[in-house]
C-alpha cells in the first residue's frame, strides 16, 4: 500500500513538473511571439519590457540640445570612466532608467546595460543639430524602425556616421530627407540596407554635395512611390548605379538627379516609368552626361516635363522620338541649355495639352533644324524665349500651329542669327499676344516671303505675320509658298 502511494505521489510530481514546464515554454513562447510581432509591425506605443527602447526621434533630439557635437550609443560597462559623476537623463520609452543619456561637455553618451532599440519613430532624431560632427551607433538596433524621415536632416557639419552599414532597415517605410543637407558627409556605406518596404525616397540624399560615390545598386525599390529629389544636388557624385532599380510603383521622380553635375554616365534605360506623372527637372543640371538612353521610357501618363533636360550641356544626342506626350501640360525650359545637341527628333509629339512652352529650345545653339511643323499648339499660352539663342537654325516650319491663345511671345526668336525663313499657315494668330518685345531681336538674316527684310525698328509682333509686301510687311512666309 505504501509503495502504491509512493508511486502515485511520484507520478503526481512528474505530471505537475511537466505541466509547469509546458506553462513555462508557452509563457516564454508567447512573450517572444509578442516581441517579434510588435517588432515587425513597428508598434509605436510600445509596452514591451523585454527590450530597452529609446524615446521617439524628435523627443531625443530636443533632449540632446543644439550644441551637441558627438553622440555615442553604447554599453554602460564600456564607458564607466567617461560618465563617472555625471547625472544622467532617462531616455527610454518606458521611463524606467533602462537607457540613460550622459552629457559631458558637448559629447553625449546614450548607454544601456543591454542592446538599445531605436524607437519605431525616428523622425528628426538629429534634425538641424548643426554642430554635430560624429555619431557612433555601436549599440543601436533599428529593427523596429518604420520612420526615418529627416533623421539627419540639416546636420551640416556631420562628417562621420559609424556602424550604420549594418542597420536593420527591413521595416522602414519612410526615408524622406534622411540625409538632406549633410554637405560634409564624404562617404556612406548603405549597400546592405534592406529597403523592401520603403515607399518614400523623396530627397533622401538631397544636397549631399560631399559624396563622391554611393552604392545603392542593390536596393529593393519595388515599393517606392516617390523618388523625387532623391539625389538632388549631389554634385560630387562621379558614379551612380541605379540601373536595376524597380520603379514600377513610382508616380513622382521630379528633380531626382538635379545638378548631379559630375556624373558622366547614367543607366536608366530599363526603368519602367509607366506610372510616373511628374518628370520635371529629372536631369536638370547633369552637365557632364554625354549620352542618355531614355528611348523606351513610357511617358503616356506624364503631365509635367518642365526643366527635364535643362543645362545638360554635354549631351550630343538624345532619342525621345517615340515618347507619348499627349498628357503633358508643361514643357517649360525642357531643353534649355542643351548646347551640344546637333539633332533632336520631336516631330511626332502630341502637344495638344501643352500650355507652357517657355524657353523650350532656348540656347540649343548647335541645332541646325528642328521639325515642329505638326505640333498642336491650341492650348499654348506662353512661348517666351522658345527658340531664343538657336543660332544655327536657318528655317522653321510652324505651319500647323494655332497660336490664338498665346499671350507671351517676347524673345521667341531672339538671337536666331542665321534664321532666314519662318513658314506659317492660317492658324498663326497674334491677336491675344500682349507681350512681344524683342521677338525678332538679332534675326538679321530673316526675310519674309515677299522680300521684307529684317528691320531693327520692328522686332515685336507687328511683323509677326505672313509677308504682304510693302503695303503689309511681315517676316513670315506662307506655307503654300514653301519651295
Describe the role of every protein-language-model region.
Residues 31-483:
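Negatively charged
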Residues 1-43:
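Gram-positive cell-envelope targeting signals
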Amino acid at each position: 500500500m505504501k509503495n502504491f502511494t509512493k508511486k502515485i505521489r511520484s507520478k503526481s510530481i512528474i505530471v505537475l513538473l511537466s505541466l509547469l514546464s509546458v506553462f513555462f515554454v508557452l509563457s516564454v513562447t508567447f512573450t517572444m511571439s509578442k516581441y517579434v510581432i510588435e517588432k515587425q509591425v513597428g508598434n509605436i506605443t510600445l509596452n514591451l519590457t523585454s527590450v530597452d527602447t529609446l524615446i521617439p526621434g524628435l523627443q531625443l533630439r530636443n533632449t540632446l540640445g543644439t550644441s551637441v557635437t558627438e553622440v555615442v550609443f553604447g554599453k554602460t560597462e564600456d564607458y564607466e570612466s567617461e560618465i563617472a559623476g555625471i547625472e544622467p537623463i532617462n531616455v527610454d520609452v518606458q521611463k524606467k532608467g533602462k537607457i540613460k543619456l550622459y552629457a559631458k561637455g558637448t559629447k553625449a553618451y546614450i548607454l544601456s546595460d543591454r542592446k538599445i532599440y531605436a524607437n519605431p519613430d525616428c523622425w528628426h532624431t538629429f534634425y538641424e543639430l548643426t554642430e554635430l560632427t560624429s555619431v557612433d551607433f555601436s549599440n543601436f538596433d533599428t529593427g523596429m524602425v518604420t520612420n526615418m524621415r529627416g533623421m539627419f536632416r540639416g546636420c551640416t557639419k556631420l562628417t562621420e556616421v559609424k556602424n550604420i552599414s549594418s542597420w536593420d532597415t527591413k521595416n522602414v517605410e519612410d526615408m524622406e530627407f534622411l540625409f538632406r543637407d549633410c554637405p560634409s558627409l564624404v562617404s556612406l556605406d548603405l549597400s546592405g540596407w534592406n529597403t523592401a518596404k520603403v515607399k518614400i525616397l523623396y530627397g533622401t540624399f538631397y544636397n549631399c554635395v560631399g559624396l563622391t560615390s554611393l552604392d545603392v545598386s542593390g536596393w529593393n525599390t519595388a515599393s517606392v512611390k516617390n523618388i523625387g529629389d532623391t539625389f538632388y544636388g549631389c554634385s560630387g557624385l562621379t558614379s551612380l548605379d541605379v540601373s536595376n532599380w524597380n520603379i514600377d510603383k513610382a508616380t513622382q521622380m521630379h528633380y531626382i538627379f538635379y545638378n548631379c553635375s559630375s556624373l558622366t554616365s547614367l543607366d536608366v534605360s530599363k526603368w519602367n516609368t509607366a506610372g510616373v506623372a511628374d518628370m520635371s527637372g529629372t536631369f536638370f543640371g547633369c552637365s557632364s552626361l554625354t549620352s542618355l538612353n531614355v528611348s523606351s521610357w513610357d511617358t503616356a501618363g506624364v503631365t509635367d516635363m518642365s526643366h527635364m533636360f535643362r543645362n545638360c550641356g554635354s549631351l550630343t544626342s538624345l532619342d525621345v522620338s517615340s515618347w507619348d506626350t499627349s498628357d503633358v501640360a508643361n514643357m517649360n525650359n525642357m531643353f534649355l541649355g542643351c548646347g551640344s545637341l546637333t539633332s533632336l527628333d520631336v516631330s511626332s509629339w502630341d502637344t495638344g495639352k501643352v500650355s507652357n512652352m517657355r524657353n523650350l529650345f532656348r540656347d540649343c545653339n548647335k541645332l541646325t533644324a528642328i521639325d515642329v511643323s505638326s505640333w498642336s499648339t491650341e492650348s499654348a499660352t506662353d512661348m517666351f524665349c522658345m527658340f531664343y539663342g538657336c543660332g544655327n537654325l536657318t528655317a522653321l516650319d510652324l505651319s500647323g500651329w494655332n497660336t490664338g491663345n498665346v499671350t507671351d511671345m517676347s524673345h521667341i526668336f531672339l538671337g536666331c542669327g542665321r534664321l532666314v525663313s519662318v513658314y506659317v499657315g492660317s492658324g498663326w494668330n497674334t491677336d491675344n499676344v500682349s507681350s512681344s518685345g524683342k521677338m525678332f531681336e538679332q534675326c538679321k538674316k530673316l526675310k519674309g516671303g515677299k522680300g521684307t527684310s529684317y528691320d531693327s525698328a520692328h522686332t515685336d509682333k507687328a511683323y509677326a505675320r505672313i509677308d504682304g509686301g510693302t503695303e503689309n510687311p511681315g517676316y513670315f512666309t506662307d506655307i503654300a509658298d514653301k519651295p
